[in-house]
């Protein structure tokens, strides 16, 4: 009875639809549209039983499929809607497949776009997704048609069509895995064409579908997609990177032939463990732990010994880092030789992002590889030598981290042999950077037996003087800092070699930016030895340091590193220099001979001048400088006061005069010691009054004043007569400062006149001097006039009558006789005839 009822209902519906079906062939598009709308209304009648709808659908199917090619878009849309409704409501939708699949293939699977409407193409792909859902395995015979459609829709211009196609393909692969693998590779090309689409949601869909397609394929296409997936690890979209992580993680867990792809897939997953997003890092680590555990269980027999006698986590393991499980470590051990060459290439890739990712991955691999990385040391070190100099700071940071891990896991005997050998052959900043990082990663116990070897190499002149670039010097300093930080008081045995390196760094032109760091390192070196500071270090090694730099002092030039090292030792050792003058002075004496290079002498005199300015804190810290005063003056300063042509020679004379002036000012020399050198010194200083340098002339006046003051009443008349003419000339100097200084020196000169200076015999000298001074009593500079007035008052006591005679001779020539009258009044009032009055 039920069957008869269904037949009657089917017959009634068919009769009701007959007229509408006929109208579908009408030329008028509006009639066709109304007919389809009516059919849709009838088909969607909720009173229809599913069995009745099944019969009606099969009756309607062919006319509806013809309508898929209708010129009117609305008609095509209604047709698709009716088919979708029927497919989702009939009990046996698979019966429509023989007609439906060819029609969909014709509309979607052609080389050229047949359906021009994006929305309708999307609707048809959604219909296809529905068919996969309701028909399942019944779609297996239509594998070729489905693949043909996917190949076109995955590269469709409309993003939504791409996404829906990916969804449909994933579902289809899951439904018929036993058949899908035969055609799976056909989808790789369209998927890879779409994987870099501008919409992130499309990229996510493509990646997810690629994962499913490969999962249900023969695995031959893994190599074809790896490079594309690797690129997506650099994607700006978090969702895209997350999708790659999930896909690769699933492959490593579930892919049928996954063992043969471990060395290719593991780097992709481990790259995600260093992602900037915490969620992705956690996701990747969770996958990695599962993969390691699964592999461990699958290979339990091979790992039996390691599982039963597992070694505890090494005590020197990096702080704050959790040790990976045995399975994870073993996976890396066994695949490291295949992974490292590729990583090494990528670390030097021209794309910055690739270099950063690769350097991050290298550190992760080394953490897993532990002592197994020893066999790959040459490749690892050559890679780090390049990456340590990368222009990207993040690459450098990651490379240094990798080098520290090498120091942690590899025996120092191994890495030192390779690094030190490379350093000796070609000293580069990258070699030093790698060495410093390896040292930091190493344990004190392991490293202490190699201290001498390390410091003997880096203190060699070819290495510590290998480059004057800041980066090189900075890494040289890092090596010493690392040794001190790791080995602490063990550094006592190599303290001298460390000092040699640090002094060389300070002697470098690049040292200005590193000076504070070097001083801090010297302080650390002294502290680990229980000393009170850098000065104690210099005190401990001064003999060896000066022997070290002075080996070639006979051949020093201004470009000699040893000369700069000598300067550093002299200026940085502070009071220790005063304790070792017996070593310091002979070197300085040899290097300041007039036959030596002028530029070098200039540098050394400048250094000496600075030391003498703080004599009590440096060269005279022990109060012993006076013992060497004669050598300083006669052997170093005086020979360099001799006139020679050239600007450099002039500069040397100026700085030599400066040293002499500072030495005299320091009050380290007694009167007796000054008298011993005065005979040799005074004539040389007088010649410097003619120097082009105002400063030199000024200091020369000051020096002569000091010498006259010290030797007061002990200078013979003939010496005095050689001094005043040059001073008188300086009263006409271009510099007012020099004129004033010369006048003050003449004031001191008059004080040196004793009864031994016979006025009658030397009357001509006094006349010449008085006349010259009287000229300047009428000087345009009022301040100088006053100074000369005081000077003549002092000098009037020598021969008053002669001075009165000279004043009266020029009084009428002066612009104002006031000063002459004042001077005459002074002479009449305060002076008395001398025992040897001029006649």
UniProtKB/Swiss-Prot annotation:
Organism of origin: Xenopus laevis (African clawed frog)
Entry similarity comment: Belongs to the DNAAF5 family.
Keywords, sorted A to Z: Cilium biogenesis/degradation, Cytoplasm, Repeat
Gene3D superfamilies on file: Leucine-rich Repeat Variant
Subcellular location: Cytoplasm; Dynein axonemal particle
InterPro entries in alphabetical order: ARM-like, ARM-type_fold, DAAF5, HEAT, HEAT_DAAF5, HEAT_type_2
Sequence ranges of the HEAT repeats: 10-48, 54-92, 94-137, 140-178, 181-219, 221-257, 259-297, 578-617, 675-713, 717-755, 723-761
Gene field: dnaaf5
One Gene Ontology cellular component: cytoplasm
Main location: cytoplasm
Protein name per Swiss-Prot or TrEMBL: Dynein axonemal assembly factor 5
PROSITE patterns: HEAT_REPEAT
Entries under PANTHER family matching the protein: DYNEIN ASSEMBLY FACTOR 5, AXONEMAL, DYNEIN AXONEMAL ASSEMBLY FACTOR 5
Signal peptide: none
One GO-annotated biological process of the protein: cilium movement
One GO MF term attached to the UniProt entry: dynein intermediate chain binding
Quaternary structure and interacting proteins, as annotated: Interacts with DNAI2; probably involved in outer arm dynein assembly.
Stated role: Cytoplasmic protein involved in the delivery of the dynein machinery to the motile cilium. It is required for the assembly of the axonemal dynein inner and outer arms, two structures attached to the peripheral outer doublet A microtubule of the axoneme, that play a crucial role in cilium motility.
